[in-house]
A protein has these predicted regions:
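Structure-specific nucleic-acid interaction/processing domains
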Residues: 1-107
């Protein structure tokens, strides 16, 4: 088994604002959210340009995170490709579609 066999697709969302962000990880969801929140706090506290489109959702007071799917991938590319399917097929704030080789901007 490799670490990508334990892949997860998750969404961060705000129902009141109708905003959704899709991501993937091999970490636990709480551990991944720790990183999202650390980066978000740096963005807010230092007035930096947003690095991640999840910040739009994290700005909402009612945001939540949810496991969408456990995904047994062979490689990072496989996991990102699956993440990209959710990004393409759902309304979301993600600017980049994962798993396209080169970063593709969502239109």
């Amino acid at each position: 088994m490799n670490k990508y066999n334990f892949g997860k697709i998750y969404k961060i969302y705000s129902v009141s604002a109708n905003l959704y962000y899709y991501g993937s990880t091999i970490q636990s969801i709480p551990m991944r959210m720790t990183t999202h929140m650390r980066d978000y706090r740096r963005y807010k506290n230092k007035g930096l340009a947003p690095r991640c489109s999840s910040y739009k959702v994290l700005d909402c007071p009612d945001w939540k995170v949810e496991l969408v799917e456990e995904y047994c991938a062979e490689t990072k590319y496989d996991l990102e490709k699956r993440e990209g399917e959710f990004q393409k097929n759902n309304v979301c704030v993600n600017k980049n579609i994962a798993g396209n080789g080169k970063r593709k901007i969502k239109t």
